[in-house]
Amino acid sequence: MSATLELTEALIACHSVTPADGGCQDLIAKRLQAIGFHTESVVSGPENFQVTNLWAIKKGKAGDQGKVLMFAGHTDVVPTGPLEKWTSDPFTPTIRDGMLYGRGAADMKTSLAAFVVATEEFVTMHPDHQGAIAFLITSDEEGPANDGTVIMCERLQKHQQRLDYCVIGEPTSVDQLGDMIKNGRRGSLSGKLKIKGIQAHIAYPHLGKNPIHLSAPAITALVETEWDKGNEYFQPTSFQMSNIHAGTGANNVIPGELTIDFNFRFSTESKPEQLRERLESILKNAGLDFEINWVLGGSPFITGDGDLAGALRKAIKTETQIDTELSTTGGTSDGRFIAKICKEVVEFGPLNVTSHKIDECVIVDDVVPLKNIYRKTLEQLIA
């Protein structure tokens, strides 16, 4: 069994449903300390939601003048769902038919193990490496993400820690290992809209104002609006409604209020304030009495095809003979926090097809190549 597969299995065996770390970071920290890393554990959050974060760094021969490449990821996993639907216990790593099964196998304990073993090999092969290697690991990525990467980035910024490159181990591959790198993510802007009407008996509509009827033209306008055209990196901004509720449940009462939950996934062509203004303008033009509670989940970020993306693409090509695709599709990630303090941020990891699913798994034969890709990226950028 390879060192990477062995460590992956050890991490999967840790029960680490958000915000629990389950001992994963201790395993990682001990391995890194053994090869000269300074490590720091930071616990954050309220008593009923304690988050564990790990910061680790090993400087190179160039000291503070050297480039810094950071591996970032999370040890927490989503809940298992019904245990009886799993073919094997989700926290007992199991190999069947060339697949390694277990919660977190794809998202993202295989990547974490590959980070560690790639770093061990790199340090052994390049003891005089010029640049620095860092790790930022949290147990609060799958949850609210209030006490994880975001606060660690604030700490790093406060201590003026420079970061040049960051590789996040999210599962980005689609059909085969190496076919996709995420070099950016769309922003997320959510809102809870309340449209006010006047409640009345349904037989006397002249005594009420039905917010469902009143809002219909505005809803149509919102759905039909082209918010932007996107660009070479991003698809056009999308607007989606996720929940609509009105009424008391009785069928003879005109509702007094309509509530709509909605979300923008937006490109770098739009700013949050522009989207807010345009949406509110549509509602005002429709003559609606409304209020909105806005939540900005994250701003979009993009890393062009520069040094980091180039090195990773070359490493993938060497290891897998695949010409990889750069993409910004999908949901948000902790990259939205890291991009504020790091010049170049990309995400790359194993196949994403089983993430968060029953019988989550990775291809066993992908584990060592993934580790090799990470090591070859280090060799190009900080050796």
Swiss-Prot record:
Q: Residues that bind Zn(2+) 1, according to the entry?
A: 74, 107, 170
Keywords noted in UniProt:
Amino-acid biosynthesis, Cobalt, Diaminopimelate biosynthesis, Hydrolase, Lysine biosynthesis, Metal-binding, Zinc
Residues annotated as the enzyme's active site: 76, 141 (proton acceptor)
Does the keyword Hydrolase feature in the UniProt annotation?
yes
The disulfide bonds in this chain are none
For this protein, the record's InterPro entries field holds: ArgE/DapE_CS (IPR001261), Bact_exopeptidase_dim_dom (IPR036264), DapE_proteobac (IPR005941), Peptidase_M20 (IPR002933), Peptidase_M20_dimer (IPR011650), Peptidase_M20A (IPR050072)
Write down the required cofactor(s): Zn(2+); Co(2+)
Enzyme type, top EC level: hydrolase
Q: In which pathway does it act?
A: Amino-acid biosynthesis; L-lysine biosynthesis via DAP pathway; LL-2,6-diaminopimelate from (S)-tetrahydrodipicolinate (succinylase route): step 3/3
Q: Which GO terms describe its biological process?
A: diaminopimelate biosynthetic process; L-arginine biosynthetic process; lysine biosynthetic process via diaminopimelate
What reaction does this catalyse?
N-succinyl-(2S,6S)-2,6-diaminopimelate + H2O = (2S,6S)-2,6-diaminopimelate + succinate
Tell me how the cofactor is bound.
Binds 2 Zn(2+) or Co(2+) ions per subunit.
* Pfam families hit by this protein: M20_dimer (PF07687), Peptidase_M20 (PF01546)
Claim: Metal-binding is one of the keywords in the record: yes
Binding of Zn(2+) 2, residues:
107, 142, 356
Protein function? Catalyzes the hydrolysis of N-succinyl-L,L-diaminopimelic acid (SDAP), forming succinate and LL-2,6-diaminopimelate (DAP), an intermediate involved in the bacterial biosynthesis of lysine and meso-diaminopimelic acid, an essential component of bacterial cell walls.
Quaternary form? Homodimer.
Family (UniProt): Belongs to the peptidase M20A family. DapE subfamily.
Stated name of the protein: Succinyl-diaminopimelate desuccinylase
Q: Which gene encodes it?
A: dapE
